[in-house]
């Protein structure tokens, strides 16, 4: 079993990507590979905080990689920062390239992080998108705040809040359960 976590932040080493890294460790306890596709590192559009714009060929290759990984995944996780009360345009751009074939009857987890006001609104918006793509948004979602993280010596973030660590384990267990017990396999 394998999954794909798509991170829709323009910032490299974002809080959302730190949460995704934390989740991948918990999937490993179930012998599940969950790969991260970080749109800050593999951009599909022109918004780029690093100051470099990738070539058209690089963008096309990134899109090809995303589509192949999404199609092969048994589940997907969509991760976003809270941008103006919703999910990021970067994630929206990526989702515009993935049709129902990539989501149909697959469990989809939703994770997000807010730097300002804590809000799960971006995840509520994504829940509607997942439904329209025929995916199955799992009930447990994770909406963190910057204060739920601490910094490693190298400057990268890690999830430091014990309540969210517990919620992350529940989230992973729920996705694994949905994949292992899917009554929808015949509908794919």
From Swiss-Prot:
Catalytic activity line of the entry: N,N-dimethyl-1,4-phenylenediamine + anthranilate + 2 NAD(+) = 2-(4-dimethylaminophenyl)diazenylbenzoate + 2 NADH + 2 H(+)
Cofactor: FMN
InterPro entries, per database record: Flavoprotein-like_sf, FMN_Rdtase-like_dom, NAD(P)H-dep_reductase
Keyword field: Flavoprotein, FMN, NADP, Oxidoreductase
Gene Ontology cellular component annotations, sorted alphabetically: cytosol
UniProt-listed Enzyme Commission number(s): 1.7.1.17
First-level EC class: oxidoreductase
Single GO MF annotation: FMN binding
Induction, per UniProt: Constitutively expressed.
Family stated for the protein in its record: Belongs to the azoreductase type 2 family.
Assembly with partners or alone: Homotetramer.
Main function: Catalyzes the reductive cleavage of azo bond in aromatic azo compounds to the corresponding amines. Requires NADPH, but not NADH, as an electron donor for its activity. The enzyme can also reduce a wide range of sulfonated azo dyes. The substrate preference order is methyl red > Ponceau BS, Ponceau S > Orange II > Amaranth.
PANTHER family: CHROMATE REDUCTASE, NAD(P)H-DEPENDENT FMN REDUCTASE LOT6
Identification of the protein by name: FMN-dependent NADPH-azoreductase
Gene of this entry: azo1
């Amino acid at each position: 079993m394998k999954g794909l976590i798509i991170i829709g932040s323009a910032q490299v080493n974002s809080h959302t990507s730190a949460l995704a890294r934390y989740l991948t460790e918990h999937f490993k306890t179930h012998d599940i590979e969950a790969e991260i596709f970080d749109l800050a590192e593999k951009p599909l559009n022109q918004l780029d905080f690093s100051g470099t714009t990738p070539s058209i060929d690089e963008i096309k290759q990134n899109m090809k990689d995303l589509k192949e990984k999404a199609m092969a995944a048994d589940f997907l996780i969509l991760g976003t920062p809270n941008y103006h009360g919703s999910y990021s345009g970067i994630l929206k751009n990526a989702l515009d390239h993935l049709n129902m074939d990539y989501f149909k009857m697959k469990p989809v987890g939703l994770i997000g992080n807010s730097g300002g006001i804590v809000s799960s609104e971006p995840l509520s918006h994504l829940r509607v998108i997942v439904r329209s793509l025929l995916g199955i948004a799992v009930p447990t979602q994770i909406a963190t705040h910057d204060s739920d993280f601490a910094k490693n010596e190298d400057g990268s973030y890690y999830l430091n809040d014990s309540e969210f660590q517990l919620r992350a384990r529940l989230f992973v267990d729920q996705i694994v359960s949905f994949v292992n017990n899917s009554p929808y396999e015949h509908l794919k």
